[in-house]
């Protein structure tokens, strides 16, 4: 029984104010209660201690979600993480909060797709010809961060979730 949604209401049982992850100490000092819970939850999820399809981070703007996510990622090699957003402007915003340590792309690029328009003038993603699944950016990283997931088409979101689950990737969605 996998849970589909994981919010900020996780009750954690940690000893002290820090956790160890990938041989690095991740301090919870300076975080408020909600941020501490989120960082602890993300770390537990990344370590495989939570049986979830993905880790959902939600909350009002200005509550420190970006700051807390960066704190949780400190225990990972930057090459293991890729961030993606629906549009180029959203990608740039994600890049601003993740910093230069991590690769950030559009969702289309993450999946090796290009943007086109259907007969109604709606933007759609289509698979690029000749793109092998193993060469896609989503396949080269262990942790996938999707920003503004509500802006992504349901079919594309389902494809990302399926790839992450089939290929044992960790998916963090905002």
Located regions from the model:
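Conserved ATP-binding/catalytic motifs of P-loop helicase motor domains
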Residues: 1-174
């Amino acid at each position: 029984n996998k849970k589909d949604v994981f919010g900020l209401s996780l009750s954690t049982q940690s000893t002290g104010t820090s956790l160890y992850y990938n041989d690095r100490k991740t301090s919870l000092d300076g975080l408020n209660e909600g941020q501490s819970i989120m960082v602890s939850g993300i770390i537990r999820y990344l370590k495989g201690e939570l049986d979830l399809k993905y880790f959902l981070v939600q909350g009002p703007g200005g509550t420190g979600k970006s700051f807390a996510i960066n704190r949780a990622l400190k225990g990972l090699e930057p090459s293991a993480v890729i961030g993606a957003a629906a549009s180029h402007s959203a990608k740039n915003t994600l890049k601003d909060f993740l910093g230069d340590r991590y690769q950030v792309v559009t969702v289309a690029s993450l999946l090796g797709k290009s943007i086109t328009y259907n007969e109604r003038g709606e933007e759609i993603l289509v698979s690029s010809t000749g793109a092998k699944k193993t060469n896609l950016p989503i396949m080269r990283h262990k942790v996938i961060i999707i920003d503004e997931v509500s802006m992504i088409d349901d079919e594309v979101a389902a494809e990302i979730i399926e790839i992450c689950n089939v290929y044992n990737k960790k998916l963090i969605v905002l």
